[in-house]
C-alpha cells in the first residue's frame, strides 16, 4: 500500500514538488543563490516549487539564479538504464584522464545538449596533448582579459576558444599570451599534473570502440578516393596515436 496521510481533502501524500521545496528550505533557507536541474524540469516542477515556496514563506523569490542543464546523449542516443548506456564519471576516468573528461564536458555550454562519444574524448585528449607543449609553472594569475567570457552565463565553449587563440599566439612567440594561456588552462582545472606525469598518462592503454575505428577507416578510404591525401594521412596519424596501425 502506498504511504499516505489523512487530510481535510482526503487521504494523500506530498507531491514531488513539495519534497524539493522542503529540502531546499531546510538546508539552504527560504531564499538561496543557485538552483539547478535539467531543462525538462522547468515546467511544471520548478514553476511549482517557486509558487508553493513563495506562497508559504511570503517571499517574492525562491532561488536567485536558475541553472538548467542540457541533456547528455551517448553516440546520439539518450542515456538511460534501459538501454544500458549510462556512463558515469568514475567509468569515464578509468578510460581517460580526468583532464580529458573535464575538457570534453566543458566543450558544450551547460544549457546545450552534449553527445558523449569516442571522437569527443579523443579530440579532447589530442587538444590537451598539444597544449602541454606550452605548459609552464607560473606564479602569475592574471586572466582578467579573458575571464569575462566565463562571466557570460558560464560560457565555457567561448572560454575554450579564447584558450585556443592564446595558444596560437604563444606558439608564435608571444610570452604574455603564454602566461595567460597557462593561467586560463589552470582556471578550468587543466594542467593539474606536470608535463612528465601527463606523458606517463598518455602511455596508459586508452581503448576506443570498434565502431569508432571503422568510422575513421571509412573516412580515410573516402578521402583517398577523393585524392584528399592530406586528410587521409592525418586520419592515419590520429589512429596511430591511439595505438591503431593501418597498413595499406
Regions found by a protein language model. Give the residues of each.
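Alpha-helical recognition segments enriched in aromatics with Gly/Pro capping
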Residues: 1-139
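Structural preference for alpha-helix termini/caps and helix-kink/transition segments
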Residues: 78-248
Amino acid at each position: 500500500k502506498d504511504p499516505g496521510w489523512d487530510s481535510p481533502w482526503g487521504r494523500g501524500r506530498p507531491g514531488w514538488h513539495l519534497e524539493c521545496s522542503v529540502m531546499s528550505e531546510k538546508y539552504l533557507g527560504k531564499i538561496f543563490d543557485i538552483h539547478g536541474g535539467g531543462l525538462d524540469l522547468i515546467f511544471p516542477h520548478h514553476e511549482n516549487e517557486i509558487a508553493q515556496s513563495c506562497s508559504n514563506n511570503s517571499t517574492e523569490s525562491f532561488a536567485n539564479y536558475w541553472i538548467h542543464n542540457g541533456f547528455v546523449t551517448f553516440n546520439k542516443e539518450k542515456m538511460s538504464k534501459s538501454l544500458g548506456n549510462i556512463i558515469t564519471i568514475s567509468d569515464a576516468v578509468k578510460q581517460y584522464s580526468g583532464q580529458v573528461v573535464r575538457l570534453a564536458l566543458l566543450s558544450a555550454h551547460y544549457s546545450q545538449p552534449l553527445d558523449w562519444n569516442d571522437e569527443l574524448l579523443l579530440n579532447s585528449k589530442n587538444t590537451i596533448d598539444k597544449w602541454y607543449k606550452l605548459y609552464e609553472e607560473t606564479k602569475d594569475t592574471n586572466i582578467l582579459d579573458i575571464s569575462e567570457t566565463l562571466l557570460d552565463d558560464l560560457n565555457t565553449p567561448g572560454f575554450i576558444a579564447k584558450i585556443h587563440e592564446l595558444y596560437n599566439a604563444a606558439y608564435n612567440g608571444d610570452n604574455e599570451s603564454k602566461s595567460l594561456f597557462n593561467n586560463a588552462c589552470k582556471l578550468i582545472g587543466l594542467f593539474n599534473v606536470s608535463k612528465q606525469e601527463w606523458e606517463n598518462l598518455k602511455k596508459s592503454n586508452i581503448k576506443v570502440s570498434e565502431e569508432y575505428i571503422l568510422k575513421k577507416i571509412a573516412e580515410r578510404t573516402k578521402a583517398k578516393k577523393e585524392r584528399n591525401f592530406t586528410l587521409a594521412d592525418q586520419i592515419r596519424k590520429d589512429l596511430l596515436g591511439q595505438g591503431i596501425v593501418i597498413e595499406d
